[in-house]
Amino acid sequence: MITCRLFLWFVVYTVLQSDHIIQGKRVVLMPMPTPSHTKYMTHVAQALAQQGHEVWLTMPDYLVKRSFLDTTNFTIIELTAFPNYEEILMEGLAERYFNYQTEDLLVFCRAGREFCDRILKNKHIFEQIKTLRPDFFVLDNLAFVKMLAIIPYRLGVPFAYLGSSYDVTTQRIPIVPCNIPHVMTGFNHHTTFYQRIVNFVLHLYPSLIDQCVYQDAVSRYAPEMPYLPIDILIARADIWLVETDHILDYPKPTMPNVKLIGGTATGPGKPLPPQFKDFMDEAQEGVVIVTFGSQVLNLPKSITQKILNVLTDLPFKSIFRANVSSPNSQKILTSSWIPQNDLLAHPNTRVFVSHCGKNGQYEALYHAVPVVATPLFADQFYNAERMRVRGFSETVDINTVSTDELRTTIVKWRPTRATSRPSQKPPNYSK
């Protein structure tokens, strides 16, 4: 099948086939101010730059300072003095999960509105972008930041939406709401009557009450422009590029201007840094990679100790992404940063214990590494369930799972040395 690298070129090709972009142009990308969304956009920025376009990408200073992304070939528009939205979101989501509290999904809307408000009211940022004389904008398609479409509207420049959101309301997709699993549930495509009611309500609610945007956003932030309700402006996007596909996800209807491009951020592994390479090469019995994402590095002590107890007892090595010290550095490598895709590409990687973010999920699929899913919040439960349905993972609740159960689950999904793949390990569909 077509490779994920070709999928990435398809994204670029699709964007550039717009009537507005034929030759080398000036493109501005504006992702959600979180590591995973910014990382995804950098892959597209690199591909655009390699095609001869001039590319700029907005990034808050707290991400710029971490220097964890490859920003060669394009220019960063640094957003200074912005709150750390990564911390704000984790306080309302991950911390509530670990405290057994109900998830506060409106924290996304509040953070997104504040982020958009700061950008859209900032004259310096607008003038900086205006000076670039951009020909095209690529905006994050999450509902929380869709008001950013006001910037290209003020400049009279076309725009596209790119990201993980399959939003039937703003993308104008005709559906039977009860039949499509909503991304904020853990439902699959085989639903009970109650689950269908929940799907119906969740799909219908944003079309009635959208708490993530201001309907009068155009008059608020661009009073000099002809008034448009924000949902009408959003619908003017030239194209919607949605990071999902029918290999991993359930069948979904689309419109002609909605393209499903799942897995575009994946690709072959790069050479590992020395400390990781030596550890992986020596692990002939295999390695389990454990991570809860770039946003969850400080786990509760009880969870951390549970994981360390399991990793210590496993008959093979492990790499644990967290702000902790390893009790046995020969067997457990701990780090606050890991080259995730490159580790998953290593032949000694056996199992991936993951929170089920979109990037990691597609990387695991690309490298055919089975997953023990530990979802924490938002769409991660949906992601975990669709992997389970595809026979490519098993889900555990990291809050309640016992040490023995977690160990047994990891060992169950680990291939033996005698075979290159376990019976459960999925073939590499995405290549």
Task: Mark where each language-model region is.
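Nucleotide-activated donor-dependent transferases that construct or modify glycoconjugates
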Residues: 18-34
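Residues that mark the start of a beta-strand
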Residues: 25-27, 287, 370
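A donor-sugar binding/catalytic signature common to diverse glycosyltransferases
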Residues: 137-139, 336-384
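Conserved donor-nucleotide binding/catalytic region of nucleotide-linked donor-dependent transferases
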Residues: 389-394, 399, 411-428
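Cleavable N-terminal signal peptides of Sec/SRP-targeted secreted and luminal proteins
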Residues: 3-21, 387
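Short N-terminal binding/cap micro-motifs at the start of the first secondary-structure element
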Residues: 36-39
